[in-house]
A protein has these predicted regions:
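Juxtamembrane helix-entry segments on the extracytoplasmic side of multipass membrane proteins
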Residues: 36-37, 81-82, 134-140
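Hydrophobic transmembrane alpha-helices
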Residues: 1-54
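Membrane-embedded alpha-helical hairpins and interfacial helices in multi-pass inner-membrane proteins
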Residues: 74, 105-169
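Central hydrophobic cores of alpha-helical transmembrane segments
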Residues: 54-66, 110-115
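Interfacial aromatic-anchored transmembrane helix boundaries in multi-pass membrane proteins
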Residues: 23-36, 61-95
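Alpha-helical membrane-inserting segments
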Residues: 18, 22, 26, 44, ...
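Membrane-helix interface segments
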Residues: 5, 50-55, 104-109, 134-135
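Short helix-perturbing small/polar motifs within transmembrane alpha-helices
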Residues: 10-14, 21, 78-121
Length: 169
């Protein structure tokens, strides 16, 4: 049992580190940088499951909250979480949760896509509140231009996680 817990903690730590590193791959655009964070969040959920995925994502958010520059473009601190794009970071929690739910491939992919929509909705709401735009206008700025790319990343993350699970036994 102890050996299995060490293995779980190792995977959780590695996933937090991977999220922190790959979050830095960001192409600046007008309001929201283009990133591959949707891929990483989905991969963590699909690979670690609900409990460990939530632990990993919570650890990532807490690291950023205390100022470690783990968020996109080497950002960290409370100001990032309460900024225009902070809602997306909070949206990682339902996103990783839904990706972590067990089931057959079509169900898991569908849940991952619902999780992505929950993440985008959190981002849209926070952006709309801070910018005083309508939800629709905020969606046009921070969500809709990236949605197809992010959906493809979620589907890709599912298949990568399945390969990883087979290789790491």
């Amino acid at each position: 049992m102890k050996k299995e817990r060490i293995r779980e903690l190792t995977f959780i730590s590695l996933c937090v580190a991977i999220m922190a590193v790959l979050s830095q791959i960001a192409i600046p655009t007008g309001s929201v940088p283009v990133t591959i964070q949707a891929f990483v969040v989905a991969l963590i959920g699909y690979f670690l499951g609900v409990k460990n995925g939530l632990i990993a994502m919570t650890a990532y958010i807490l690291l950023g909250l205390v100022g470690v520059p783990v968020f996109a473009s080497f950002q960290g601190g409370l100001h990032t979480l309460i900024s225009y794009t902070g809602g997306f970071i909070f949206g990682y929690l339902p996103f990783v949760f839904l990706c972590g739910v067990n089931g057959k491939a079509p169900v898991r992919i569908a849940l991952g896509l619902v999780g992505l929509l929950a993440c985008h909705l959190a981002g849209i709401i926070q952006y709309a509140c801070l910018s005083e735009l309508s939800l629709w206008s905020a969606a046009l700025v921070v969500s809709l231009p990236f949605l197809i790319k992010d959906m493809a990343l979620v589907v890709g993350a599912y298949y990568v996680s399945e390969i990883m699970k087979k290789r790491i036994k």
